[in-house]
Amino acid sequence: MGIRSLLPHLWIFGLLGFGVYTWRAVEGWGGSDLDGSTLTPSGPAHVLGLAHAIHLRPTLNYGQEILNFSNLVGKRPAVVMYFMDWQGNPNASGLERYFDPYLLNTISNTLPVSARPAVMLTWQPLHGRQATGCAQDYPGAIPLPDILNGKCDLYIRGFAQALKARPERFLLRFAHEMNISDSPWWVGHIGADPSLYVAVWRHVHRIFKQVGVSNVEWVWNPNYASNPPDPWNDLHAYYPGDDVVDWIGLSGYNWYATRSPAIWRMFTDLYDAVLKDLACSYPKPQIIAEIGSVEGDGATFSKAAWIRDAYSRAPSYPFLRVVQWFNDYAYADPRSADFRVTTSTAQDGSVQPLPPSSGAWTSAYRDAIGNSVYTTTLPALSAATPPARFCGGDPFALAPAFLLLPPTGEAVVSITGIGFTVPLTLAPMLPSGISGTLQGGVWNPPWAASSLRIQTTNTPLGFYTGSVRIQGPGLSRTLPISIQVVSRVYPIWIPMVRR
């Protein structure tokens, strides 16, 4: 894991004459998150849930394929994902040269607006066009240095303009699984420097920003485990930065006997450690962008049981907002691992049925997503983004818990809650002479943030204690606040340098 400087907010108190000098780092307070992330008060009563999402292989009538799948499993997806390379449609004109809208048009022609999913584009820097100099270096991907040096800027800009012109909400999953040697854009093929990947990501993102694209959200998606597991290849080394990432995605499968060694890996074996690690590292909503399991021996190891277990455990991870099943063969190859839960359609339109013994797969999936926690709407990014990082432990935090105030003055306290499961209400309990204004007094799972503005008005000097009471079904917590009212408060800023 890359070294991340977590700078505590340093207060040093010294009594000089009749006042109190306070020494503070310039970074400011960030609730339970020490990196200065903005805390947003909770909005209207709304339980986020987890968005039901699916990868379906593109077909001639993709909209009908989505509709058929929805009917089979009893719930429409909030997100649909498919793969695309960097070739576009060289025979088209205008923006269609950079982005072929055929699949999206079949969706809009088949599904009513209310039933159309958000679209995750897994955007792979493959193929390109020799004539433009932005081309694949076979058998690898388009070389990352070529992208960074601007050889693909014309295509990237045209692609960005094409997406901007569409009405859909896009999740752009660019150059995914960059931390495994199977990936054509893994930097280990040309060296061992993940900063190259980071620079390429930021370069591509910068072009989208210049174009002014507002309907694209960026999904950074490593594999759940780095391969090789060398320190330089740690997935955190590939993180491009909070300012250019909207969602964190993950990929991980139970391959069992289709890959060596033949280990039956449950959901927690794949995802538990990495979901918690990422929640502790980045205040970003999480997506399981590729998940699937093959069949086991049918007795000790069962695919149907695996599905039920995975979907029952996913809601316990507070940052996880989307679970997206990979409803296809691995690599779209019928000779490879079969992760499907329903029949699928080949590109020629032929139906690829499930094996005769697999009737339980669809039933298990239908039952699993039938849980009301799995929704048919992807929450807005602002609602899906957690208020702070969370490293486990106490889900409730109040900061700063100690205030220095003059007799007439004010300060703002941030209150965060992460990982709770029942609706909560907040109430400030402050002593006489000190008032408080609470923004966001109703919290809904899985997280929320509020701010409490504390004011003194001709308050006598002295030491005061108060609290914020958090209550809900089966839960009652009190977060203490200490307030020292002094004649004067002198702020002295100490610049802190990250190393």
Residue ranges of predicted features:
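Long beta-sheet-rich domains in secretory-pathway and surface-associated proteins
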Residues: 383-490
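Alpha-helical scaffolding within the catalytic cores
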Residues: 60-69, 94-108, 154-159, 224-240, ...
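Sec-dependent, cleavable N-terminal signal peptides
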Residues: 1-33
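Substrate-binding cleft of secreted/luminal carbohydrate-active enzymes
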Residues: 34-62, 84, 285-382, 386
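Structural recognition of the beta-strand scaffold that forms the well-ordered cores
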Residues: 49, 77-84, 118-123, 171-174, ...
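Glycoside hydrolase catalytic-domain groove-lining segments
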Residues: 95-122, 243-297
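Aromatic-lined carbohydrate-recognition surfaces of secreted/lumenal glycan-active proteins
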Residues: 205-233, 283-296, 322-328
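Substrate-binding cleft of extracellular glycoside hydrolase catalytic domains
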Residues: 86-220
